[in-house]
């Protein structure tokens, strides 16, 4: 039943997971940099 909604569990989940991870890391880095700059200012 878990294979019905996802027909291609070979490219979609992997790509989505990778994109999500990279986006999350980038967001955290940007937020940290902005916060640091704001505090330093």
Curated annotation (Swiss-Prot):
Query: Tell me, how does this one assemble?
Result: PSII is composed of 1 copy each of membrane proteins PsbA, PsbB, PsbC, PsbD, PsbE, PsbF, PsbH, PsbI, PsbJ, PsbK, PsbL, PsbM, PsbT, PsbX, PsbY, PsbZ, Psb30/Ycf12, peripheral proteins PsbO, CyanoQ (PsbQ), PsbU, PsbV and a large number of cofactors. It forms dimeric complexes.
Q: What does this protein do?
A: One of the components of the core complex of photosystem II (PSII). PSII is a light-driven water:plastoquinone oxidoreductase that uses light energy to abstract electrons from H(2)O, generating O(2) and a proton gradient subsequently used for ATP formation. It consists of a core antenna complex that captures photons, and an electron transfer chain that converts photonic excitation into a charge separation. This subunit is found at the monomer-monomer interface and is required for correct PSII assembly and/or dimerization.
Q: Which InterPro entries match?
A: PSII_PsbL, PSII_PsbL_sf
The protein here is known as: Photosystem II reaction center protein L
Where mainly found? membrane
Q: SUPFAM superfamilies from the entry?
A: Photosystem II reaction center protein L, PsbL
Name the encoding gene, please: psbL
Name the GO cellular-component terms.
photosystem II reaction center; plasma membrane-derived thylakoid membrane
Q: What residue intervals traverse the membrane?
A: 20-40
Keywords annotated in UniProt? Membrane, Photosynthesis, Photosystem II, Reaction center, Thylakoid, Transmembrane, Transmembrane helix
The way it spans or sits in the membrane comes to: Single-pass membrane protein
The entry sums up its family as follows:
Belongs to the PsbL family.
User: Where in the cell does this protein reside?
Assistant: Cellular thylakoid membrane
For the biological process aspect of GO, one term held by this record is:
photosynthesis
